[in-house]
Amino acid sequence: MISVNKVFYAHSERFQMQNMNVHIKAGEVVSLIGPNGSGKSTLLRLMARLLKQSEGDIVLDGKSIHTMKSADVAKQLAMLPQMHDHQLDLTVKELIEFGRGPHKSWRGRLNKEDEEIVDWALSVTNLEGYEYRLLQSLSGGERQRAWIAMTLAQRTNVLLLDEPTTFLDIVHQLEVMELVKRLNEEFGMTIIMVLHDINQAAQYSDRLLVLKRGKLQYDGVPEEVLCHEMFQHIFGIEVDIFQGSEKPFFTPKRISKKGGAKCEQKNVLPLS
């Protein structure tokens, strides 16, 4: 579906991404985790063609992404960046209609199919009845769902989300994560997201990619990646790891001075 092949990228002397190799399969939910400045958002922006690597290639559905027309990329891949303008003088429906941009005719008007897709995006994100509300009048969670609805209106197979739960309270975080789960399970969307909440990443993802200083350090299912060595190596903390009903989760204990190593076994504590 989307592959990052031997990519090199540097935006300053202090940060370099070297020989990055990632392959995302169709239908996967993949979360990028790691400390601040590790390259998570940079990797996502490279995949979205918002940044251009100096070496290597990024392939979307068999085609080099930098040889494709922008409109063709936008028909296959949508990205919601971390920050958006919440003060736009737009209604929810007007915002969502922007998602139809890559599909519009040269006249720029919405046809019947466009209107049906906008209505579908409103329905999927539980925003029916909000279409004529101004963005400024919405709660944080409602606004985030409106922006996600705009990306859904592109009708792509791949959705990139950069910290979609940042600045939201726990209820609205769970609303967004449950929406991500539904988009994957009901509509088969491939979803790649940057998350700071590692427990949420483990709960809602098929795979975790762990970055540090521009390098991919761990790549695997949550049960394998969430181990004591990873937390020591990547975050410099000691943790307790528990096995939930489906996925593992952790609680932090203290800052660690140990270096960490590879996760060679499942260091999981049973729930009492």
Swiss-Prot record:
Coiled-coil parts of chain: none
Protein location: Cell membrane
Gene3D superfamilies noted in UniProt: P-loop containing nucleotide triphosphate hydrolases
GO molecular function: ATP binding; ATP hydrolysis activity
KO phenotype (gene knockout): A mutant lacking fatE, fpuC and fpuD ATPases is deficient in petrobactin import in iron-depleted conditions.
This protein's UniProt keywords: ATP-binding, Cell membrane, Ion transport, Iron, Iron transport, Membrane, Nucleotide-binding, Translocase, Transport
Family indicated by similarity: Belongs to the ABC transporter superfamily.
Protein name, as recorded: Petrobactin import ATP-binding protein FpuC
Organism name: Bacillus anthracis
